Amino acid sequence: HDRKKTIFGPNVIFDGERCIKCTRCVRFCQEITKTNELAVVNRGDHSTISLFDGAMLDNPLSANVVDICPVGALTDRDFRFKVRVWYLEKTPSICPGCSTGCNISVEAYQNKIARFKPRVNEAVNSHWICDEGRYCFHDLAGGERLTTPMIRQEGGLVPTTWEQALQAVYSGLSSTKPLAAILSGRNTNEEAFLFAKLIKNFAPEAALEVFCQERELSETQKIIMSPDRSPNFRGARDMGVSSNGGCATLLDELAAGNFSSAFVVGEDLVGSDERLRAALQKLSFLVVQDTRMSETAKLAHVVLPAAHFGEKEGTYTNRKGRVQKLNAAVIPPDGARQDSEIFMQLLEAAGEAVAYASPSEIFAAIAREVTAYQGLDYGSIGEQGAELTSGGGGAS
């Protein structure tokens, strides 16, 4: 018998007794990643797959060898023995890890995301996804969820009703200027479209930006990964979430104490940059809309519980201008609301009547108002996405 349960790397285990020596995994490391961690060793009926010369299978795309193994000899350490695959409910969607917009299947069990698998799209990610994207759902969808709005009273956050929370947000943001508004790059085009309308209603001169973090990439990472971690950075800016100063400039101004109020959606600013803690503590009014009680949310005057990427439907626009669909794979907990629903309720409180019944209706409004999206139809985007009709342009 060949070896069993051999650790090849941080994400992959090898069961040699299942292996048929097809060498797909070896060729993947030679031809795709060009990192050459795997090799066939020995001869005849003693031949086996092995790590080459003491290497570890730890390249940024390593878990793809699990997907291409035809017999289950290579297994995913994160998913191994978690759930029988035939119990999984599979939903086509888009990876929220970066602005490449890799096509994925979100596979869930008992209303929890169990794993991401790559979905073929030759125009975007071919057959692959990176390990960072494959496992990012643990951070984005894990942890204890917020399920009730909270409002600050006598120095602490206490539960409140949605009606009271939304009224407090409207009153606070309407009366406390200047305003900084930061939207997560994981919010959909439809949510960004509504958020831009909302902030411009509250304060036309507000500093409005989509959160963005960039990183340096190795040559192997560049095969599929984007320097920009925000999957819908381009789309959000197309929707008007931009006051043209850039996110870094806005955060510098926030740290310098140049704002009296802030509305932060879906990002933990303190977790990303500790220097912002003191500045956020000094704000006269801070609203945080998020899925969990983050370090930033702990400082808020009002906290609104929202849905995460796997619980929503809509579209992302990747860095190359391809509009692609997200689909809801799981149901949000009772008490949490869709970001788009929250924005529409605040717009209604501000006297702007918006009553879109679905993301497709919001997208139809986008196609009317945003130049680059004219001619696009939500129903015809399909599972492979659609290219923008022109080079991009903000909401008119």
Task: Locate each region found by the language model.
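N-terminal export/assembly segments and adjacent metallocofactor-ligating motifs
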Residues: 1-249, 256-264, 268, 346
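A generic structural signal for solvent-exposed, polar alpha-helical segments
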Residues: 134, 141-143, 315, 322, ...
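Acidic, Ser/Thr-rich low-complexity intrinsically disordered segments
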Residues: 376-393
